Structure formats: C-alpha cells, structure tokens
Amino acid sequence: MAGLFNILKVTVSEDKICAHVLVNPGMPLMTSEDIEATARVYYLVPAIAKHLCLGDSGREFQDCMGQTELCHLLEHVTVELMNETGLAGSISCGRTRVSEHDERVFEVELSCPDDALAIGALSSATFMMDWAYLHADQPAPDVEGTVAGLRNLVLGMRAEAEGKDPHEAVAAANGEDAAEDEGADEGDVPVDAD
C-alpha cells in the first residue's frame, strides 16, 4: 500500500540529516488540498502552530500551515517529535526545499546532533501523516507513546555507546528504579508463609 511519502535517501552529517523525500504520485502536494487531514495533523501535535517559521508568510508556522507543501508540514511534525523527547539539544530546526529537478521531491533538512533521533522522528512523523491523510478511519497514532519510545531508543543507544547497560540508563533517565523491574511481576501478590 502506498503512503504519502517515499524517503529516497538520507544523508547524515555531524549536526544534521538531509532526507530526499518523494511525495508519491496521486498524493496531494499542498496542505490546502486536504485541509481536514491537515487539521488532524495539527490536533496530533498542536505545538507545531507556534514554531518559528521564516520561509513562508508570517513568523509562525500557523500563518502558513493551511497553504504549504506537505513536506514542510512533515518537517515541522518531525522537529516537534524531536523537541518533545527532550534529547534534541537546545535548538532543533529544519528547512524544506523543493528539488530543482522534480516538483514532487523535496530536501528536508533537520538540524539535530543525534542522527538516530532525527531519523526516528522523521519515520514517526511520516507514519502520523499517513494516518491523517490516508487512514483517518483507523485509531489515531499515540504521540505520547511514540515520543517515549523514541526517547528510550536514543537513551539506550547512547548508554550502549558508552559501555553502560541501556536498560539501567533508560530507567534512570525516566526516574524509574531498575531494580524494581526485576524479579516481581505486576500481578505478583505476596503470599503469607504461615
């Protein structure tokens, strides 16, 4: 089944990734072509409306959200997912440009010092937009759960790279006691030894 987007290529550099994204044939190029779907995206991640956006009319993304490229919306959803993890650093931002060779191909540049976080957020944003534009009859994506999953993935990868136990690092970062998780199941009930 075709989705809205096809990620053609991802280039990773030290502080950003650049994804070449095809808006699949037959899919809308502009948010104005399906304003209800665009509104569904907004309801999933309402903070995108207040993102600083210098490329279009106005100062905030809400000023152009109803009439911009779908890949521009994808950029803002991705940046918001990165921001919500709390792991993207002090500034995460993006930039979207149409390809010189094909009006359906866009370069989506995401500034973030963690390539796994940026790629994971891009993949998650793609899934969320597919839901909003193509599968709104299905249950809505769990944004909070997605953010938690991305956060745990990145924390685990960082811990592993430092030679630490990823499970302990994730539990500590989330304020959980790793020892609590071992041994007892939720359904275990103490038994009186009399």
Q: Across the structure, where does each feature detected by a protein language model lie?
A:
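Noncatalytic linker/hinge segments flanking ATPase motor cores
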Residues: 59-67, 114, 146-156
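Acidic/histidine-enriched alpha-helical segments
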Residues: 53, 132-158
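Short, surface-exposed linear patches
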Residues: 41-45, 129-134
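Short amphipathic alpha-helical segments that mediate assembly, nucleic-acid/protein binding
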Residues: 70, 143, 147, 166-169
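His/Glu-rich zincin catalytic helix
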Residues: 1-86, 175, 185-194
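M16 family metallopeptidases and their MPP-like homologs
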Residues: 82-129
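Generic hydrophobic/packing signal
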Residues: 68-70, 92, 96, 100-105, ...
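Scaffold signal of the M16-like zinc-metallopeptidase fold and its non-catalytic homologs
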Residues: 73-83, 121-132, 153-194
